[in-house]
């Protein structure tokens, strides 16, 4: 059994308030009603104030310790699963935590092994290892039912987590869900380039989101990821699923979310496309839609329970 230990780390972060965090949508609130009630303006940010946060570590025998931050609260809890080499302090993760705080719900955000504050070597990372990281967070830190929010590659992993822990994962929210995308993009390369990557052991994938202009992805990561592809067959996930995707996404085509929606067994699936949003979905309107979709899922699950 993994053990969580707390490292008191003083940090000053801005306190935020969502202008419409507690809007009541009524007992029969659906997605169309939710979108209709989203205000046209962005959330109103209040002046920064001091707030002490704490960084914790999940100790795992024979596995790297995972850095995480956990907000205690009521169920269902929210777990944010980041994208490739992304940290737990990203825009979406922080916005979700603040939104959960305003509603009194539990929230967990974490760094994969080899990433951010977690132990491990990023060059030794694999999708399978990160899958184990997600399951460790669910098994050892999360209390009760959970809504998983997966960003990009995190959306791929949230599907795997839902398959492995159906009794605990009660809803999914994917943002630019990158199911199978890394493998698909690599397989689309010219044969000569694929051979070159195999010889070098690294694929320098161009990306405007990297400071270096490329993501240096280990060839071993790509080959191992082939064992975790999902879109070739029905995906045994039956919980409510919401998939958000920007139509200007030049990293993960928005059609990927459509494929996921088609492959999952769940009949409660909504795909929401934003015409002018890119891969990161970090604009204020994107974040607003994200947190309101979480709120809608919480309301839906509460209605089912009651």
Curated annotation (Swiss-Prot):
Residues 78-177 form the AB hydrolase-1 domain. InterPro entries: AB_hydrolase_1, AB_hydrolase_fold, ABHD10_acyl-thioesterase. It catalyses: S-hexadecanoyl-L-cysteinyl-[protein] + H2O = L-cysteinyl-[protein] + hexadecanoate + H(+); mycophenolic acid O-acyl-beta-D-glucuronide + H2O = mycophenolate + D-glucuronate + H(+). Pfam families: Abhydrolase_1 (PF00561). One of its GO terms (molecular function) is palmitoyl-(protein) hydrolase activity. The keyword Mitochondrion applies. It is found in: Mitochondrion. GO terms for biological process: protein depalmitoylation. It comes from the Eukaryota. It is an enzyme of class 3 (hydrolase). Its EC number is 3.1.2.22, 3.1.1.93. The keyword Mitochondrion applies. The active site is at 152 (charge relay system), 249 (charge relay system), 279 (charge relay system). Residues 1-52 form a transit peptide. One of its GO terms (cellular component) is mitochondrion. Keywords: Hydrolase, Mitochondrion, Transit peptide. Inhibited by palmostatin-B. Acts as an acyl-protein thioesterase that hydrolyzes fatty acids from acylated residues in proteins. Regulates the mitochondrial S-depalmitoylation of the nucleophilic active site residue of peroxiredoxin-5/PRDX5, a key antioxidant protein, therefore modulating mitochondrial antioxidant ability. Also catalyzes the deglucuronidation of mycophenolic acid acyl-glucuronide, an active metabolite of the immunosuppressant drug mycophenolate. Belongs to the AB hydrolase superfamily. This is Palmitoyl-protein thioesterase ABHD10, mitochondrial. It comes from Pongo abelii (Sumatran orangutan). The gene is ABHD10.
